[in-house]
Design a protein with these regions (language model features):
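Short, charged beta-turn/beta-strand-edge "cap" motif at the junction between a beta-strand
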Residues: 11-14
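Ferredoxin-like alpha/beta domains used as RNA- or RNAP-binding modules
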Residues: 1-2, 9, 19-80
Length: 80
């Protein structure tokens, strides 16, 4: 699920598109590079988001994202 795009289904950010940057059990962390940055991602329950079928990052882009967090927000914005 990490690297996929997701749409928020509940909360004040309902309808917003995010990139899944981390997951842990029933909780995922989302970033959009604008209001939710890579350094301070949004924590959301899995049932409150829906994955987008097309889009996201492949494994090489994700590795680069995690190794170089200084440019992470720009890369996330481009992906969305």
């Amino acid at each position: 699920m990490v690297g996929k795009l997701a749409v928020s289904l509940a909360g004040h950010d309902k309808g917003s598109i995010f990139l899944v940057i981390r997951e842990d059990g029933d909780v995922i962390w989302l970033a959009d590079g604008i209001s939710r940055l890579y350094q301070s991602p949004k924590r959301k329950k899995r049932k409150h988001v829906q994955l987008v079928l097309n889009g996201g990052m492949d494994s090489s882009e994700l590795e680069d994202l995690f190794q170089n967090p200084a440019d992470a927000d720009t890369k996330i914005k481009r992906c969305i």
